Amino acid sequence: MVTSCTGHVLDNQRATTRGVFSSGSHLVTLHFQPHPFFSCVTDAVNGARSRFSAFYPKANYGLQGSQPSDVRAHNRAANGACDEYKQLKVLSMGRQKAVIKARREAKRVLRRDSRSHKQREEESVTSLVQMGGVEAIGMARDSRDTSPILARNEAQLHYLKAIESKQLIFATGEAGCGKTWISAAKAAEALIHKDVDRIIVTRPVLQADEDLGFLPGDIAEKFAPYFRPVYDVLVRRLGASFMQYCLRPEIGKVEIAPFAYMRGRTFENAVVILDEAQNVTAAQMKMFLTRLGENVTVIVNGDITQCDLPRGVCSGLSDALERFEEDEMVGIVRFGKEDCVRSALCQRTLHAYS
C-alpha cells in the first residue's frame, strides 16, 4: 500500500508515505518509508533528478541519476542548499526555499517517530551547505570501504611499505597480484586524510593493437574503459558521490588522462598512478618521470609479460628498472606467480602459460 499526500505526512507504519512540495519550477520530493530504509529524491534544476539514499542506522549516502547529465545538471544548481538529516540518514538538496520546506517535513517526521528518534529536534537537522550545491555533494560521502589496507603476502607488504616511504615506486609482476588495487586504495587514503590535494591516473592507450578512435564519444568517454580498473577501486574507497564530486573539472581532485597529456606538466601535492607502464617507451618514461614536483608520490605499475609495444621497441618500464635498481630513494617491488591473489584459477592460468 502506498499513501501519497501534499503538504503533510500520514503516520502509517505499514505504508510508504510520500510528501511532495513545490517551490516555483523547482520540486523537492521526499519519500518517507518505514525504517530501516529512507530515501530522498530531489528535482533541482531543469528537471534533473538525483537520488540520495541511505540504509539506517549507518549513514550510507548514495548519489545516483537516471543519466550522467542529470547528475551534472543537478550539481550545477545555483543558489542551492543541502541539508543532512542525521537520524534519518538522508540528504535533501535543491533550491534553498524548497529545501527549507523539506526540512520542516523532516522535523515533523522526527517528532512523530519519537520511538526511534529520541534526540532533540534541533540536533536532527544540520544545514551543511547553503548557496553552493557543488560543495554539498562534496560533503555527501556515501558508503565506502573503510577497512584497513592489509598485505596478503610478503610482496604486497613490501609494496605497501614502499608507497608509504618512497616518492617513486615501481611495481612489476604478473596479473592479479594487487598492484592496481593497492596503489589506488593508498591514493584514496591519502586524499581522504588530506595528505595530498589530488589523484592523477594515467596510462598509455596502446593495448592489443586497439585505438581510441574506434570508441565512441569525446576523449574522456573514449578513455573511460581503460580507466575502469582504477575507477572501481576509487569509488569503493571514496564513495560514489564523493568520487563524482572529485571528478568535476573545476574541482580536479581526481583526474584521469591519456599518457600523452602528461607532457609539459608538473605534479605537486598529488599521488600519480601510471598503470600499464610496460607500454610506454624509454623516452616517454623519461618525460613522465621528469614531471615530478614537491610532495608527490608516483606509482608506476606494469607487467613486462603483457607488453604491446612493436617488436624491437624497448619498454620504458624495463629500462627504468635497470636505471633505478641501486637507487635508495626509489622503491622497486617485483611480484611473482606465487603472489597472485585474484583467484586460484588465475594462479593456475599463470602457471599454465609460463
UniProtKB/Swiss-Prot annotation:
This protein's name: Protein PhoH
Keyword Membrane applies: no
UniProt subcellular location: Cytoplasm
A Gene Ontology molecular function term of the record: ATP binding
NCBIfam families, per the entry: PRK10536.1
Gene3D superfamilies xrefs: P-loop containing nucleotide triphosphate hydrolases
Principal place of residence: cytoplasm
Keywords: ATP-binding, Cytoplasm, Nucleotide-binding, Stress response
Superkingdom of the organism of origin: Bacteria
Protein family: Belongs to the PhoH family.
Leader sequence residues: none
Organism: Escherichia coli (strain K12)
